[in-house]
């Protein structure tokens, strides 16, 4: 059984409408509970263009499939994934928090002091930025870093350890250790979708990180600065599933 819930882009998720809560509507929560009580194998298809706090919902069903509004082909796409004709491989482009209490005031746009987004939020979340499951499993191996002119070359290998082919979205993050200013806990500097990886197959993934991507704007000197010191590169399946870590020390530079 499939319970379809969520929002409608022309009714309650229009761009000019701000939500006062990230809680799922009570009626939808109750619907899923009642359906799941009759059939414990009920799957939820959540159609949403923004995050919900669905921690309680997660406890009542074995699987949740998320899709944004997909126009007239939405139903066909969901059906193909649920029947195994296609393997889901999407990733969250937003952090999904556990409750309203995890968020600052709606009018507070300071992402650093308000600890907004995966870059600064330091508590447990429901689903992290970049998260997503598929019908296969992948392992990450052998991260390598090489300095080149004006950039840092980062490569790693991923292996399909599952029993069917699927896509994997490899994500690369960086963190500046010991910065003299407040920098993100981690910052996305690259991602790549690797298509149709067969069972037991290994693929190499390479990122070219430009040095300017590691810089920040210094308000005192009024220029972009690349700090000396240690930069931690992390690769994995989401912002909190980073199985490969490597250290690099790029050459300092600054310019107006």
Regions inferred by a protein language model and the residue ranges of each:
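Secreted, periplasmic, or luminal enzymes acting at the cell surface/secretory milieu
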Residues: 47-167, 173-175, 183, 199-201, ...
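Short glycine/proline/serine/threonine-rich loop/turn segments at secondary-structure transition edges
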Residues: 213-230
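Beta-sandwich strand segments
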Residues: 236-244
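Hydrophobic helix-and-loop "lid/oligomerization" segment in the mid-to-C-terminal part
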Residues: 1-59
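Single conserved hydrophobic/aromatic residue that forms the stacking wall/gate
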Residues: 245-256
């Amino acid at each position: 059984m499939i319970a379809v819930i969520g929002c409608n882009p022309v009714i309650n998720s229009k761009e000019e409408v701000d939500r006062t809560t990230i809680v799922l509507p009570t009626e939808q929560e109750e619907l899923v509970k009642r359906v799941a009580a009759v059939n414990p194998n009920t799957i939820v298809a959540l159609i949403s263009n923004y995050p919900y706090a669905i921690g309680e919902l997660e406890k009542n069903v074995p699987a949740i499939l998320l899709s944004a509004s997909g126009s007239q082909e939405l139903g066909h796409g969901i059906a193909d994934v649920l029947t195994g004709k296609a393997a889901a491989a999407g990733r969250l482009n937003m952090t999904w928090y556990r409750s309203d209490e995890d968020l600052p005031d709606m009018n507070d746009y300071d992402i650093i002091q308000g600890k907004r987004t995966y870059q600064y939020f330091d508590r447990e979340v429901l689903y992290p930025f970049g998260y997503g499951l598929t019908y296969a499993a992948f392992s990450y191996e052998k991260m390598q870093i090489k300095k080149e002119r004006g950039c840092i070359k980062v490569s790693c290998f991923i292996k399909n350890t599952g029993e069917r082919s699927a896509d994997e979205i490899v994500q690369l993050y960086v963190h500046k250790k010991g910065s003299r200013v407040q920098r993100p806990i981690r910052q996305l500097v690259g991602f790549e979708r690797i298509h149709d990886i067969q069972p037991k197959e290994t693929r190499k993934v390479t990122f070219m990180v430009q040095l300017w991507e590691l810089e920040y704007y210094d308000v005192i000197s009024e220029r972009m600065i690349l700090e000396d010191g240690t930069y931690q590169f992390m690769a994995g399946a989401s912002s909190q599933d980073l199985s490969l870590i490597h250290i690099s020390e790029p050459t300092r530079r600054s310019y107006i």
